[in-house]
Amino acid sequence: MDGIWNYIVVIYWIVMGCSLLMVTIKLIIPQYIFSMDEVTQNKEQVFQTVLNVIERDLGIRVNGLSINYDYSENDELKGFYDPKNHSITLFMDNMETVHSFVLTITEEIHHSIFVSSQSGMKLYQSYHRKVGYDNNPLEYSAKVYARDKFKQIHRILKKKGLIFYKV
């Protein structure tokens, strides 16, 4: 009988240790665990806040930019900027976490600034034909900018109460 109690105590401590580990992970890096739909009620305000941060950072004003949230299946894209109607489309099913949402929206806003003109679009397409998507300097600069600004944007979104993590 004494051996059974020892097993029960060991199992109890293993379960408690795993639970404590999961809570600790959720507290330390929640942006890599939760999806955007789980942590915010108003994605439009999140978009406007990210846009305002980028406008302040670059010292410019972006007029008439709209955003669409698409929940349909798409195997290739997380989002794209359409210069014809000056809009961003985000494929929400392809973004598992807050981190990927913020990075994608920042990249697409960056594209709306630097690829929105006819000459910018021609330059983008020229690079795309010559070196492909992964080596396109306009794509690379958008990705680097998004990575550099993630912590600042994430902090502002949390401070304004636009995203909140339930642990």
Stretches found by the model and what they are:
Residues I88-I105:
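Short pre-active-site segment immediately N-terminal to the catalytic Zn-binding motif
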Residues G132-N135, A146-V167:
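Long, well-structured alpha-helical subdomains associated
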Residues Y81, L90, T104, G161-V167:
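Polar low-complexity intrinsically disordered regions
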Residues T49-V53, S141, Y145-K149:
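Amphipathic alpha-helical segments that form well-ordered structural scaffolds
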